[in-house]
Curated annotation (Swiss-Prot):
Its main location: cytoplasm. This is Leucine--tRNA ligase. The keyword Protein transport does not apply. Keywords: Aminoacyl-tRNA synthetase, ATP-binding, Cytoplasm, Ligase, Nucleotide-binding, Protein biosynthesis. The gene is leuS. It comes from Aeromonas salmonicida (strain A449).
Length: 858
């Protein structure tokens, strides 16, 4: 029994014990309620950062809590191992992505173990292994056979430096999010999965996600973007083709004064063939910013095509303009423009001298659209037969007329677009499609799967090795020459179903073992960043429905409850170099002085240079303000780091790293160790006799059981882990009131056992050791979470403070149900009260039941 708390000596030993005993191995048990807890798996970048530590600690606390509550817990871990950073690192370090990735996995695995995370390592998977992506390829061919996969030429965001397609969300200020290179528009053939076929279900089922944060649900609803409107066909003067547009505001249709089309629209390209100026403008539009946030703020530009559309209801000719804010891959690539009632259209019309016509006004007034569009719904005017109609009346009447004339159709539209899964990179799962000599495209036969990605490659930093190697693509199909697809899957493919593969990671007869999948799924608790709301979390929901429709799972949704943890922030410091640039200095290399409010007033780096404090910001490589978790674990121990992470902030809020906060967490653990050591060193502990407890002892026991109730609710239901820890710390202060008689010691034993079990999900190593120290036979990992004793929480007595003229003059311990009159009698009979009322006349008595008696006398 060690007198001092030395985490560096106990933590490795406890971790070895867990490994040897396979404490966290999960086995399907039909007689025990299951709980599947999952944190988003890491990309093996080389080292864990504090964001990982926070995510995985939260998941581990929930898992351990559920295990102590008798659940059969599955908590697996694996590696989201494909992706561009491995290629960039391989080029930089003159290696191949595979060895770089596998080395990182090994290193990070040891880091995860060092944190004491209770994973079932037998289920570990890496998405870059053929036994994983084989089933992804197989599933893709099945989706192709069902008509849910297609290939088409598509305008994409192209990064010329990384030579890959970027999603709209990966374009920041018209530059690549990874390398800051200006993005171009490029037409290339791509594979798509029809997520739009599931748009309605994905939207409707959001209502069933009761355990998800409202913000994430709102983000997904907006991303899917269901709208009801009308598809309208315009005839083009002198052309056989019709121009299709979609609008949610057919009530404004009589106010159309021009039509905007995308630079890639067939009509635009046709007009440009004889118009060099237009051709040059279209070329310029190829580099238009396409991230939606930027579309709203960028300069609107356009050029007339010389073509005219015929308004289908009043026969007016309206000019057709190429506009840089109309995108070919959104909707039909054309929009009807109503500058009187749409501000973007108004700005464009004003800039280019186009007509602005008002057709909607408030029900109780007039409208002026000379300076700005009137965008509210109202009553129609200047609209012929539709004058006087309100929004819904006009919507129906105009839609009906367009349908009757064969120029329109009511339709439900979605902002969501089909999922482009092709990537022009090497380090990803090969797309399992073949092209035959005659151009026919077929899926790779099942007996040829997996299509293996060669790992022994040389990276030149320019072209994918499987694109550069003509021999790799050559294969046969039914005796014919065939060529493999050289694009690889978007890495969101792997992360869209990994949670299901954990249920049977070694199963080789299919993608999933249905019995195991249906035993564990859906995931009961998922933990990850809110930045994944509209991509990973939506794709995983989509994939789950695909798996269900393939008969592989029988649930509709993958994740019952979702917790989005906040970011980890740290102080950032910099100084200016000779050129005026910022040189960022690690906070671990800076000494600071603070004022009385804790604000930094001066900061000096290790070279004696005064540095500028730029505030608390997200830990990042760019600002050099990441705190190395390994360094912190080596210095303070994993339990201290875990305790600080869970205590310093509510789980879903940002967490500010603080050395003093970490030191405070360690002081608390030392105090707990010392208290337990002193208690155990005092010898054998008698049995607790509740009936024999004094009122002071009952008060301590009452606080103990109130704490059990609060911590159970905070951890289990509310997931406010910081308030649970605060309650345990407060309880520890109360334990100091206990003396050394037999029932004091018996009560201390009950309290320490309770505290150790309740803290063990957060600080499992010290929990393991203290449980043994307290003489408990089995591991704390197999203990039972304490249950609050309702009888102990009932207050039979109250402590009433007695004041004379607002000053405290005594305290009374009284029965809980005592009347005011009886409290007054006891107070007036109390010697210390009599001393201050002697010779005075009582004028008034104020009583706060069970708390305070204030006697006003003069």
């Amino acid at each position: 029994m060690q007198e001092q708390y030395v985490p560096q000596s106990i933590e490795p030993a406890v971790q070895k014990h867990w490994d040897a005993k396979k404490t966290f191995k999960a086995v399907e048990k039909v007689d025990k309620e299951k709980f599947y807890c999952l944190s988003m798996f890491p990309y093996p970048s080389g080292r864990l950062h504090m964001g990982h530590v926070r995510n995985y600690t939260i998941g581990d606390v929930i898992s351990r809590y559920q295990r102590l509550n008798g659940k059969n817990v599955l908590q697996p871990i694996g590696w989201d191992a494909f992706g561009l950073p491995a290629e960039n690192a391989a080029v930089k370090n003159n290696t191949a992505p595979a060895p770089w990735t596998y080395e990182n996995i090994e290193y990070m695995k040891n880091q995860l173990k060092m944190l004491g995370l209770g994973y079932d390592w037998d289920r570990e998977l890496a998405t870059c292994k053929p036994d994983y992506y084989r089933w992804e390829q197989w599933f893709f061919t099945k989706l192709y056979e069902k008509g849910l996969v297609y290939k088409k030429t598509s305008s994409v965001n192209w990064c010329p430096n990384d030579m890959t397609v970027l999603a709209n969300e990966q374009v920041v200020d018209n530059c690549c999010w990874r390398c800051d290179t200006p993005v171009e528009q490029k037409e290339i053939p791509q594979w798509f999965i029809k997520i739009t076929d599931y748009a309605e279900e994905l939207l409707n089922d959001i209502d069933n996600l009761e355990g998800w944060p409202e913000m994430v649900k709102t983000m997904q609803r907006n991303w899917i973007g269901r709208s009801e409107g009308v598809n309208i066909s315009f005839a083009i003067e002198g052309q056989a083709e019709q121009l299709e547009v979609y609008t949610t505001r057919p009530d404004t249709f009589m106010g159309v004064t021009y039509v905007g089309i995308a630079a890639g629209h067939p009509l635009a390209l046709q007009a440009a063939a004889t118009n060099p100026g237009l051709a040059a403008f279209i070329e310029e539009c190829k580099n238009t910013k396409v991230a939606e946030a930027e579309l709203a703020t960028m300069e609107k530009k356009g050029m007339a095509t010389g073509l005219y559309a015929i308004h289908p209801l009043d026969g007016r000719k309206v000019p057709v303009w190429v506009a840089n804010f109309v995108l070919m891959n959104y909707g039909t690539g054309a929009v009807m423009a109503v500058p009187g009632h749409d501000q973007r259209d108004h700005e464009f019309a004003t800039k280019y001298g186009l007509d602005i016509k008002a057709v909607i006004k408030p029900a109780d007034g007039e409208v002026d659209v000379s300076d700005a569009a009137y965008t509210e719904k109202g009553v129609l005017f200047a609209s012929g037969e539709f004058d006087g109609l309100d929004f819904q009346g006009a919507f129906d009447a105009i839609a009906n007329k367009l349908e009757a004339l064969g120029h329109g159709k009511r339709t439900v539209n979605f902002r969501l677009r089909d999922w482009g899964v092709s990537r022009q990179r090497y380090w990803g799962a090969p797309i399992p499609m073949l092209t035959l000599a005659d151009g026919t495209v077929v899926p790779t036969p099942e007996d040829q799967l997996p299509v293996l990605l060669p790992e022994d490659v040389v990276m030149d930093g320019i072209q994918s090795p499987i694109k550069a190697d003509a021999e790799w693509a050559k294969t046969t199909y039914n005796g014919q020459e065939a060529f493999r697809e050289t694009d690889t899957f978007d890495t969101f493919m792997e992360s869209s179903w990994y949670y299901a593969r954990y249920c049977s990671p070694d199963y080789d007869k299919g993608m999933l073992d249905p019995a195991a999948a249906n035993h564990w799924l859906p995931v009961d608790q998922y933990i990850g960043g809110i930045e994944h709301a509209c991509m990973h979390l939506l794709y995983a929901r989509f994939f789950h429905k695909l798996l269900r429709d393939a008969g592989l799972v029988n649930s509709d949704e993958p994740f019952k409850r979702l917790l989005c943890q906040g970011m980890v922030l740290a102080d950032a410091f910099y100084y200016k170099d000779e050129k005026g640039g910022n040189v960022w200095v690690s906070p671990t290399d800076v000494k600071v002085e603070r004022d009385e409010k804790g604000r930094i007033t001066k900061a000096i780096d290790n070279d004696g240079r005064e540095v500028i404090h730029s505030g608390m910001t997200k830990m990042s490589k760019s600002k050099n303000n990441g705190i190395d978790p390994q360094l912190m674990v080596e210095r303070y121990g994993a339990d201290t780091v875990r305790l600080f992470m869970m205590f310093a902030s509510p789980a879903e809020m940002t967490l500010e790293w603080s050395d003093s906060g970490v030191e405070g967490a360690q002081r608390f653990l030392r105090r707990l160790w010392r208290l337990t050591f002193e208690h155990v060193s005092a010898g054998a502990v008698p049995a607790l006799d509740v009936a024999a407890l004094t009122s002071e002892q009952k008060a301590v026991r009452r606080e103990l059981h109130k704490t059990i109730a609060k911590v159970s609710d905070d951890v289990g239901r509310r997931q406010t882990f910081n308030t649970a820890i605060a309650a345990i710390m407060e309880l520890m202060n109360n334990l100091a009131k206990l003396g050394s008689d037999e029932q004091d010691r018996a009560l201390m034993q009950e309290a320490l056992e309770t505290v150790v079990v309740m803290l063990s999900p957060i600080t499992p190593h010290i929990g393991f050791e203290l449980w043994k120290m307290l003489g408990k036979g089995d591991d704390v990992d197999h203990a039972t979470w304490p249950v609050a004793d309702e009888a102990a929480m009932v207050e039979t007595e109250k402590l009433v403070v007695v004041q004379i003229n607002g000053k405290m003059r005594g305290k009374l311990t009284v029965p809980a149900e005592i009347s005011q009159a009886d409290v007054e009698k006891l107070a007036m009979a109390d010697a210390s009260v009599q001393k201050f009322t002697d010779g005075l006349t009582v004028r008034k008595v104020i009583y706060v039941p069970g708390k305070l008696l204030n006697i006003v006398a003069n």
